[in-house]
Amino acid sequence: MTGFRLSSLPAIVVLALLLIVALGRAGLAQTPAAPAPAPALPPQLITIAETRAIIDGAIAYARERNWRMGIAVVDHAGDLIAAERMDGGSGRNPRFAEAKAFAAAMYRQTTETLGALYKTRPDRYFGIINMYGNKVYLVGGGVPLAVDGKLVGAVGVAGLPEGEDEKAARAGIAAWEKMRPAQR
């Protein structure tokens, strides 16, 4: 039996093995790279800080009037970012608020407008309700959020006297608009 000889390997294989060993040792001597910074949010998303400003602005509107409500903020796709119920408010209000926000995001209109359209053309807008089931609520209180004409989300408010849900949602949006230049 003959022993293994380095000279019996083709020269290219020997060079490849030496290169692998050299690179492996060089890699061990290097310090690990710092982790990459977190990527910036795409422009179609709103931050949790922006969401908090919307919620706080709407709640301040309700508190000034000694009312209780639920509020929800959804992203551009209608997915929930956050929902809250004020102390003493109905447990159903955040769900109704989310359904209003979802409808406003999906159809890029206020739920007040959608509700009026449903009344004039129920055959056309009945499909909205059938398509999404209880995820849409076509009464006032859902308002889309846009930046530079592009939808970034929507706000829904529920539980206030008639006509006041949308005003509270708009108060939240006004608070968001004030803080946005500092955030982006």
What residue ranges belong to the model's regions?
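Intrinsically disordered, low-complexity segments enriched in small/polar residues
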Residues: 1, 22-25, 125
